Regions:
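Structured secondary-structure scaffolds
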Residues: 1-46, 98-102, 154, 170-312
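N-terminal, positively charged nucleic-acid-binding surface of large information/translation enzymes
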Residues: 1-201
Length: 312
């Protein structure tokens, strides 16, 4: 009988959990409980997603450090889930030392295999704030659907992933000034090189895992439309440092590091409960992975995260 590894999407730590968070958590909790009742050895992990511009901007609004904000909201999340009697085996955090260790190790593996490239690109820079405007630090009109308040990384209206430079009429989220393009260096994961492995994995996993139809269609669209190298670094202060010469002062993009939180939280559980996390994450013949996510998170869980694991 295979063991069952269950995850629910890591909620952003910048606010109180909403119904969308609870639906995923409750669904995963019901499934994990059913698995245990049927005799499956089950590990259910979740935790707060703590890095990225969502946290930085919220901390700036409240006049506290990102670390202080994360500590406060992590406990709010944990208390709400305790009230709902969610039976996590571990509810962790992506700002933990073990998360940094595993993310950097995976990056080094990808880099050693030639799957990381360096590119100098133009990004939006705010002269007033004296910083590059990554992700939520810039808002503007979506070039795909025309939504007037799209974020720099993703349009909340149509769900399309974006680059900040694609926005029409961009504005700095902090001071509302109009940013200007400026050159900066970033690191990219070579998704086209991983595509054959990803396609093979997706064809098998989507059938065996009973993927929802929208997950299959969205993933196939990403692959069909052509995978491109994707930036995995950001010009931010709050995040996991990039362990590569020439990239001091940069951190990993939150959607590169966040899904790895499932692994690091399992590792934290293993340290507390006396098991090796690799027995859950590196034993596909004996472990089945079940992930409960929202539709906005599909490509990160079916393309970006598995590509990181397959490539490393």
């Amino acid at each position: 009988m295979k063991r069952r590894l269950v995850t629910s999407a890591l909620p952003y730590v910048n606010n109180v959990p909403h119904l969308g968070n609870l639906i995923q958590v409750l669904s995963a909790d019901v499934f994990a409980r059913a698995c245990r009742l049927r005799g499956y050895d089950t590990l259910y992990v979740c935790g707060t997603d703590e890095y990225g511009t969502a946290t930085e901007t919220k901390a700036q609004e409240e006049g506290v450090s990102p670390a202080e904000l994360c500590g406060r909201f992590h406990e709010i999340h944990a208390e709400i889930y305790r009230w709902f009697n969610i039976a996590f085996d571990k509810f962790g955090r992506t700002s933990s030392p073990v998360q940094t260790e595993i993310v950097q190790a995976l990056f080094r593996d990808l880099d050693a295999k030639g799957l990381i490239s360096e590119q100098t690109i133009e990004q939006l820079y705010c002269d007033s704030c004296e910083r590059f405007l990554a992700d939520r630090y810039v808002r503007g009109t979506c070039p795909h659907c025309g939504y007037a308040d799209a974020r720099g990384d993703q349009c909340e209206a149509c769900g399309k992933l974006l680059d900040p430079t694609e926005l029409k009429e961009p504005k700095c989220s902090s001071c509302q000034a109009t940013p200007k393009p400026r050159a900066t260096k970033h690191l990219y994961i070579d998704l086209p090189a991983i595509r054959p492995q990803l396609e093979s994995w997706m064809k098998e996993a989507s059938v065996k895992g009973f993927w929802a139809n929208n997950a299959i269609q969205m993933t196939q669209a990403w692959i069909r439309d052509g995978l491109k190298p994707r930036a995995i670094t950001r010009d931010l202060k709050w995040g996991i440092p990039v362990p590569k010469p020439g990239f001091e002062g940069k951190v990993f993009y939150v959607w590169f590091d966040a899904p790895i939180g499932y692994i690091s939280i399992a590792a934290a559980a293993g340290k507390e409960q006396g098991f090796d996390w690799r027995s859950w994450w590196q034993d596909p013949d004996n472990v089945e992975l079940y992930q409960f996510i929202g539709k906005d998170n599909i490509p990160f869980h079916t393309v970006i995260f598995p590509s990181t694991l397959l490539g490393s």
